[in-house]
């Protein structure tokens, strides 16, 4: 039976999930997880406690409980459950208070709330990424922080959206298609913004597998076509001196981090 995991917060639970996933990824096990955000009242906390206790009674194993709860009274209720508690905020806050000589003054949603100056940057960047996805328009390339290039289904769209959501980076993306292969070159709008260009490539066999799941037994998904497109686009990257990385078997988080590392782009959030 897969170990049970709870991610709990009086906010979005993003912090609890990120830290929890980072810790649990060190173990070669499959986990069954439940995320419970916005536990902002005593009644909600008591309900979560019942869920944790019911899980313990049903399985006979104490579930893992990762939480980032600001309010002490909410946190105390979770502490009193039958779960194994991993409290990220308290783990780091107490030592920091001692080191900084300042008492923490917790404010709910300070990190992810609208009052945060990064909120508007996030929304603007997300809208930009969606409006400039997959070469829909070339009118706004001058406003982009980054323009991702590559063949269809190599990871451009998820990478653009992740960069916008996590870091407030305005990322456009442009695909090179089968029709481009006979005379592959950069459109004028991309040439004008060459310093913003960054390429993504992928192993042709993996690309074939991805495309097969979308358009099985088509020319678009054939291994021959995948090999041709990847080869031609990589040659163009080298010819135009466009930096690029291989996305094969990498998560979108890893791809985004590599892009930031290579380009030196500054995060607009955090």
Swiss-Prot record:
Pfam families: Kinase-PPPase. It comes from the Bacteria. The keyword Transcription does not apply. Its EC number is 2.7.11.33, 2.7.4.28. The keyword Transmembrane helix does not apply. GO terms for molecular function: ADP binding; ATP binding; phosphotransferase activity, phosphate group as acceptor; protein serine/threonine kinase activity. InterPro entries: Kinase-pyrophosphorylase, PSRP. Disulfide bonds: none annotated. It catalyses: [pyruvate, water dikinase] + ADP = [pyruvate, water dikinase]-phosphate + AMP + H(+); [pyruvate, water dikinase]-phosphate + phosphate + H(+) = [pyruvate, water dikinase] + diphosphate. Keywords: Kinase, Nucleotide-binding, Serine/threonine-protein kinase, Transferase. Bifunctional serine/threonine kinase and phosphorylase involved in the regulation of the phosphoenolpyruvate synthase (PEPS) by catalyzing its phosphorylation/dephosphorylation. Belongs to the pyruvate, phosphate/water dikinase regulatory protein family. PSRP subfamily. PANTHER family: PYRUVATE, PHOSPHATE DIKINASE REGULATORY PROTEIN 1, CHLOROPLASTIC. HAMAP family: PSRP. This is Putative phosphoenolpyruvate synthase regulatory protein. It comes from Shewanella sp. (strain ANA-3).
